[in-house]
Curated annotation (Swiss-Prot):
This is Protein PET122, mitochondrial. Residues 1-8 form a transit peptide. Keywords: Activator, Membrane, Mitochondrion, Mitochondrion inner membrane, Transit peptide, Translation regulation. One of its GO terms (cellular component) is mitochondrial inner membrane. Its main location: mitochondrion. It comes from Saccharomyces bayanus (Yeast). Required for expression of the mitochondrial gene for cytochrome c oxidase subunit 3 (COX3). PET122 seems to work by directly interacting with the small ribosomal subunit to promote translation initiation on the COX3 mRNA. One of its GO terms (molecular function) is translation initiation factor activity.
Length: 260
């Protein structure tokens, strides 16, 4: 059992903090927390505060509880709550938090179990935390790193998942946007980063859905049908039999008449 060196929060303060959280007054709850820096929350209260802060997208409270209570005491946080926290952090531009949530989940061994349902749930949580980490990196480095670096992070986190789960463009809007930014730069190295990833790179791609996802992102940003045909032709020269579900959706949504 973990030893707690800080005194537990008093009953009166605990009640006020719980009431503020349940009533949706997260700024008030955060103020109480900051006034009680030397006091420790019990695990039940901690999860309640985190859950309410997440439901209300109050990222300041999430970050404060994370850095001042969860990490110092190495407390376990339920996997689905971690996923929701990561989503809030992504959209509120606390872009270093998702990677920390993933590391915490992996270090604590959360969600591991022997039953099939426990295993499926653990895989779903792992997928979501990795996905948000990829998206946070793409969003935070949109204009400061090359597309190839974002793609490398994607492969490290998503391409290596056991079972090769489907990877769909709709789940990676920030990465798709990064492909568009690279295209707008019209720099040779960036254009190469988009097209040379189709088979002319040292990185090993394992999941059959990874390269089609990149293809779909490129197709979403090409200027017109002529360029789309060229990209598709180049892709087909390198690969056969890969799922082109997303590519077909993108082509249809863009109004291109191309046989995939």
């Amino acid at each position: 059992m973990l030893s707690i060196t800080r005194r537990l929060m008093g009953t009166d303060v605990r009640s006020r903090l719980l009431l503020s959280s349940l009533n949706g007054d997260m700024p008030g709850a955060l103020l109480l927390l900051r006034q009680q820096q030397q006091a420790s929350m019990d695990v039940e209260l901690l999860h309640t505060v985190l859950a309410r802060a997440t439901a209300l997208a109050h990222v300041e409270t999430i970050a404060y509880v994370w850095y001042h209570h969860v990490q110092p005491r190495r407390l376990a946080v339920e996997g689905r709550l971690l996923c929701d926290m990561a989503g809030v952090a992504l959209h509120q531009d606390k872009l270093f938090l998702p990677a920390q949530f993933l590391q915490h989940h992996q270090t604590m061994g959360l969600g591991r179990g022997t039953s099939a349902s426990a295993s499926a749930e653990a895989q779903a949580v792992e997928f979501e935390l990795r996905r948000v980490k990829v998206e946070a990196f793409a969003r935070g480095t949109m204009h400061s790193t090359a597309l190839s670096e974002k793609w490398k992070v994607f492969l490290q986190e998503m391409d290596t998942l056991p079972g090769q789960p489907p990877l769909r463009l709709r789940d990676f809007p920030q990465l798709a946007r990064a492909v568009g930014v690279a295209a707008q730069l019209q720099q040779p190295q960036e254009q190469a980063a988009a097209l040379a990833l189709f088979g002319r790179q040292p990185l090993v791609v394992k999941n059959e859905w990874s390269l089609p996802l990149l293809l779909s992102a490129v197709l979403w940003h090409v200027p017109g049908p002529a360029q789309a045909r060229r990209v598709l032709a180049e892709f087909r020269q390198c690969y056969r039999g890969l799922p082109l579900t997303d590519a077909e959706v993108v082509i249809k949504r863009r109004g291109f008449e191309i046989d995939t």
